[in-house]
Design a protein with these regions (language model features):
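Extracellular "spike/adhesin" assembly and maturation modules
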Residues: 1-66, 78, 92-99, 103-108, ...
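Surface-exposed loop/edge segments in extracytoplasmic proteins
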Residues: 85-86, 113-115
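Short consensus segments that form the blades of beta-propeller domains
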Residues: 68-70
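Short, conserved acidic/polar surface loops in the N-terminal third of protein domains
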Residues: 72-73, 108-109
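Feature captures the catalytic cores and cofactor-binding loops of soluble hydro-lyases/lyases
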Residues: 73-76, 82-91
Length: 118
């Protein structure tokens, strides 16, 4: 079993030497890296409810007063995994490309910036 969680990424680490790391925590690590670790691209951040027919990998930032599966998840990153919404709390310094706005936005002091056009 891993002994620690890395605070910035939330990844598990610290397996004992020789211990197999291929368990639920390693699976969680790989999924987390795939969802949030590479070039975060957000389809939209203005929606208050999840889209009706998301495709696996679709990523959003729920807007204020979110409803349904997104209720209480405002400012988090929501990824549809093909069966359910998976959420992650962003950390200071995360940068995301907001597709429908063509802007880069950074997370700081508990909120996403308005962004800069690119």
């Amino acid at each position: 079993m891993p002994s620690s969680t890395e605070p910035r990424s939330g990844l598990f680490y610290g397996w004992s030497l020789g211990e197999s790391g291929w368990n639920a925590q390693m699976d969680s690590n790989l999924k987390r890296i795939g969802r949030f670790g590479f070039h975060l691209s957000i389809k939209d951040r203005d929606l208050t409810a999840p889209p009706g027919s998301p495709t696996a990998g679709d990523t959003y930032i729920p807007a204020a007063t979110a409803t349904g599966a997104w209720a209480g998840k405002e400012t988090q990153v929501a990824v549809w995994d093909g069966a359910a919404w998976v959420f992650d709390v962003p950390r200071t310094g995360w940068v995301a490309f907001i597709e429908d706005e063509a802007k880069l936005s950074a997370f700081y002091s508990g909120a996403w910036s308005a962004g800069i056009a690119i």
